[in-house]
């Protein structure tokens, strides 16, 4: 076996970096002057070419990520194309340095350019941050595509025509003569009647760039070109942007490891991708007035308020009286996050583990790790519970493990069996959840599970589940509200019935 020396490896990396640097001059970069931008809308085909500070890097990236998450959460509960969505999203966009609606465009070109620049930079930063796993790539591509689709549908035809001037593929608007020559074919293929078609705007593009429309059967094909109406232009542009994104992120991933910015840039990129799914930290600190959780309450809590991942590990612990390291860490930090004290956590694990091993062996082999998670050993830093992103993207389970995310790490049939064991979900609800998991929409699958388990309508929760402890907290809120409502109805005085005069 031949090993490459450290010096040779360093030289290899330098050679690759030199090659990348030499290629940069052939890459077209985004405009750096206000007069150069073709229109404030863009399809993100040219990366930014100016320098920014780390402070601006953080500010722009986090602003865009928060906006995309707000967009996703709202889209999950309100139809994307109705007025309610527009009104609610407009309020969420207040103060955002990005043109989302046409009437937000400033009067001065310099101001437009600054917003355009932040739009461009934010998009490409997130590309870098989310290029390292297929799940992250797919999430960003989908949400950026939906966001662009929403923005394009707000615009007039003239604005979209201006945006077409800045695309890197050929797309042409049909002239009057060409349109009239094939008007009957266009009517038939695009399902317009005789009076509608002459007043419609049509475009043509290489058929390879219209696969989505061809699949739907809504285009006219002729000599390698696809002809389609203006109504489908947005589909073409969004599909092209998403394809470009996926290809670009795959290339970025190959070069990310040899960047000279490891000390400053890569930690920031990791933070962005991790924060895409996680909200607040669950470190076990409970607000005043919270219910004290004890080990004797866990069985009942697991049945009604645990996410499937935690319920799976809890049941495994009760049946097998043991958890492997990955499950002990994932489940242990979750229990810490819901407020289980260190003493209660040790007592709970000892009760189960000592059904197979001695108490001394438990103390020697497992007690230290529990105390470590609570910040009482080692570095003495209290650890926080794992978010869904951490569970999904790190330390995937083997066939004999019980940790991980059931929606991500279970085969479809196995997942359906697990969901069926709850005996609460209906068959069609299980199918719905399994379909979302198969589409890699794990957060939506878990959210639907939550809603069905709590007798809510789809979208009734009003947010996406992105953390097992969030699942627990939201469940406990609903349970508390329903108990309070029941008590209130029982305490209400019975209506007084007047005695009727029968005389």
From Swiss-Prot:
Is the Translocase keyword given for this protein? Answer: no
- Which cofactors must be present for this protein to function? [4Fe-4S] cluster
Q: Name one GO cellular component term.
A: alpha DNA polymerase:primase complex
Q: What InterPro entries does the entry give?
A: DNA_primase_lsu_euk, DNA_primase_lsu_euk/arc
One of the GO BP terms on file: DNA replication, synthesis of primer
User: Molecular function terms in GO for this entry?
Assistant: 4 iron, 4 sulfur cluster binding; DNA binding; metal ion binding
Q: Which positions in this protein are listed as binding [4Fe-4S] cluster? A: 309, 388, 405, 446
Iron is among the record's keywords: yes
State how the cofactor is bound. Binds 1 [4Fe-4S] cluster.
Stated role: DNA primase is the polymerase that synthesizes small RNA primers for the Okazaki fragments made during discontinuous DNA replication.
Q: Which PANTHER family match?
A: DNA PRIMASE LARGE SUBUNIT
UniProt record similarity statement: Belongs to the eukaryotic-type primase large subunit family.
> What is the protein name given in its UniProt record?
DNA primase large subunit
Gene for this chain? pri-2
